[in-house]
Design a protein with these regions (language model features):
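Glycine-rich Rossmann-fold phosphate-binding loop(s) that bind the pyrophosphate
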Residues: 41-43
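Rossmann-fold NAD(P) dinucleotide-binding segment
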Residues: 95, 99-102, 109-124
Length: 188
């Protein structure tokens, strides 16, 4: 037969699926009482990540950082208006990361944005932007210090993104007891 319909979503379904995966990870791995989040990035994925996160955590405080402060400010104004949340644009990543319960990175950064000094007990980080070999949002040294690293697919993260860079830097071993999200969800 003939084609009845064609869905041209321009990546929207992929973006929503990515945000849903972030929320599933946060539900499984972050503290249930998490109320504050740092969005590192101020694009479509950041907005979708927050929308999905709010379905699984009682978020009421949001900090936003973007390389372009004007973009973080405009994003924050729109987000506060549309959500009713307390949203603060931040000039630095340090300011955004101060005392938040969850951080979500969703940038195309080639250089680490989150470093060891941002880590503290109870912080959950959902890193979404490192989907290519050259991308890296979290420093290898920070990754070496986390209590738990969970990937959607270890076979992919060993060649792309943060784990790839930490392995290449020699700060974590290939058999460091990393888990996949599916294993965590299955109670393994």
């Amino acid at each position: 037969g003939l084609l009845d319909a064609l869905l041209l979503d321009n990546g929207y379904l992929t973006a929503v699926r990515t945000a849903a995966a972030g929320a599933v990870a946060a539900r499984a791995l972050s503290r249930a009482d998490s109320r504050s989040v740092a969005l590192i990035g101020a694009g479509e994925q950041a907005a979708l990540q927050l929308q999905a996160l709010r379905l699984v955590r009682p978020i009421d405080n949001v900090r936003v950082w973007a390389r372009d402060l004007a973009k973080a400010q405009a994003f924050s104004v729109d987000l506060a208006r549309d959500s009713g949340l307390d949203v603060m644009p931040c000039a630095t990543i340090d300011e955004a990361m101060a005392e938040v319960d969850i951080a979500i990175t969703c940038t195309p950064s080639r250089a680490p944005l989150i470093d060891s000094h941002h880590l503290r007990p109870g912080l959950h980080i959902t890193a979404m932007g490192s989907d290519a070999e050259h991308k890296n949002e979290i420093s290898p040294q920070a990754l070496a210090q986390v209590d738990r690293y969970v990937a959607d697919r270890l076979s992919q993260t060993r060649i792309l993104g943060e784990l790839h860079h930490a392995l290449a830097a020699g700060v974590v071993g290939d058999e460091s007891g990393f888990a996949e999200l599916g294993q965590v969800l299955a109670g393994q």
